Amino acid sequence: MKKILTILTLSFFIFTNSFAGSDGELNLSKKSKPVKDCFEPLNRITFAINMGLDKVIFKPVAKGYRVLPSPVRAGVSNALDNLTNLVTIPNNVLQGDLKKAGINTGRFAINTTIGVLGIFDVAEFIGFPKYEKEDYGQTLGTYGIGPGCYLVLPVIGPSTVRDTAGSFINVMGGDPWYNASVNANNEYLSDKAYAASRVMTGVDFRAKNIETLDNLEKNSMDFYASVRSLYLQDRQMKISNTEDIVETMDDSDWEEIEAN
């Protein structure tokens, strides 16, 4: 039972990255294709269970993490963000954006070495721009593959059929960090290193968005529908690479909701 809970928790932290863009900004486009909520009754039940788990586990842990000094949390965020380049770069290539692939490769090399494993974003300081994160779900979308039905996965949260498939590509060989730490079986890295990075990604994300999610829940007539709309619009924006923004959530990831 303990092992099952551990796997579910890690799964949640793996999927939280699908919300966060570069610097964690969540941007919503004005136009997005409608996505069917084929399993809405079941999705709502799963959503309610997830919210219960968040209140008793994830949110308290996130509050504890926020006790750490801001520079420490910033360094952790930078290091975790640096690792996401290992998924972003191959997706830049798959999407035909070789310029961004080259820049992100340079960012990763500089920050991993001079920036001490990514703790310091030296690359941005010397002029390497920071682009939005890319993932396999986005790449499938650029290939014209539709999102399929909207899903709320246990513990993991909002997704679609396409995004779920894209996320599983990571653990099927599409994530070099997963391959190096879990599959390589070397003396320097192990599955514990990967698990730790995923857990910290989730904790960092949740800690940045405590007030945002509280405000969203407080001001929503239907919290489930609000989260669904937020997720689907954000994913569509990232796939289309639009800069037409209706709302931006920030605090590195989702600090506050600003309605135009």
Where are the predicted features?
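Membrane interface segments of multi-pass transport proteins and intramembrane proteases
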Residues: 56-74, 126, 137
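Disorder-to-helix initiation segments
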Residues: 27-43
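Alpha-helical scaffold segments that form or flank carboxylate-/histidine-based iron centers
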Residues: 41-42, 71-78, 101-111
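Mid-length scaffold segments of soluble, non-membrane domains
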Residues: 82, 89-161
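A structured, mid-to-C-terminal "fold-capping" secondary-structure block
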Residues: 21, 25-30, 143-260
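Sec/Tat signal peptide C-region and signal peptidase I cleavage site
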Residues: 15-20
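Positively charged n-region of N-terminal signal peptides that target proteins for export
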Residues: 1-4
